[in-house]
A protein has these predicted regions:
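Membrane-interface helix-boundary motifs at transmembrane edges
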Residues: 59-71
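A transmembrane-helix-recognition feature enriched in membrane-embedded lipid enzymes
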Residues: 238-257
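A structural signal for short, hydrophobic/glycine-enriched beta-strand patches
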Residues: 87-242
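Membrane-embedded alpha-helical segments of integral membrane proteins
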Residues: 13-60
């Protein structure tokens, strides 16, 4: 792979150091936009890989055998990484459709950021999905789950409660859980309020890219939830978040939390 890549760049007249500079510049530009930091990080990562590639080429001039071994190891690791990312991405994509048609008597709405007292775009998308589900299933009780973080004047739970009641959902159908600071806490604390007897039938509302990881966490807690997706409005953000979620899934599987 490395040799072919080197030959291709020479054939096309590409200067690898110019490529590195371009990816770094692209990363800096993308990083200026809120919500796209992970995509910016990918650009810097590609630049780093190209730089490492060039170092291996330079090493080959003085230590050809060592360079060959390192090139082979690099190619293998890169190939396995791409394969693992592709498989994980496919699993995330498959889980993103959820099961909106299935009825659940209890619903958990996972929190997201609040700007002061106003729901962020991601949180608003989740709330709109929850609202649609509650409208279609008038007997369903929901828990809005999320504590108060930095830059938030009220808890995520309070923000969600205000949003749903303003849209006409009966306040008696909404339970506020305002202590959770992570998805695992969202699920655990919400189930404590709902009752664990609903573990096999509870619905969970979250962004479509987050459903796969949320389901992994739920199953670890002994739940078998109905996953309900909230569609990310902008395609560019959706791609960014799906890519970020691949890394988040592996982080969770390796380190937990």
């Amino acid at each position: 792979m490395i040799n072919k890549g080197e030959m291709y760049m020479k054939k096309k007249g590409m200067n690898p150091w110019v490529c590195i500079g371009c990816f770094c510049l692209l990363g800096l530009l993308i990083g200026l936009f809120p919500g796209y930091r992970f995509s910016a990080g990918i650009c810097f990562g590609i630049a780093a890989l190209i730089g490492l590639f060039q170092l291996l080429i330079l090493l080959g001039k003085t230590h050809p055998k060592l360079s060959k071994i390192l090139k082979t190891a690099f190619s293998l690791c890169l190939s396995l990484g791409i394969l693992a990312a592709a498989i994980t991405g496919a699993a995330i994509m498959s889980a993103s459709y959820g099961r909106t048609e299935q009825e659940s008597g209890r619903l958990i709405v996972l929190g997201a950021g609040v700007n002061g007292t106003v729901p962020s775009l991601s949180l608003r998308e989740r709330l709109d999905a929850a609202y649609a589900y509650l409208q279609d299933h008038p007997n369903t009780i929901c828990v809005v789950s999320g504590g108060q973080g930095s830059g938030e004047d009220i808890s995520e739970a309070e923000c969600m409660y205000r949003y749903l009641t303003a849209k006409g959902i009966d306040p008696q159908r909404i339970i506020r859980e305002d202590q959770a600071t992570s998805t695992q806490e969202n699920l655990t604390y919400s189930m404590d309020l709902i009752g664990w007897e609903y573990a096999s039938s509870v619905g969970i509302v979250s962004s479509e890219y987050h459903l796969f990881r949320a389901r992994l966490m739920a199953r670890e807690l002994g739940m078998d939830p109905i996953m309900i997706p909230a569609e990310t409005t902008y395609l560019s953000l959706r791609v960014n978040y799906f890519l970020r979620e691949i890394a988040a899934v592996w982080y969770y599987m390796i380190l937990g939390g």
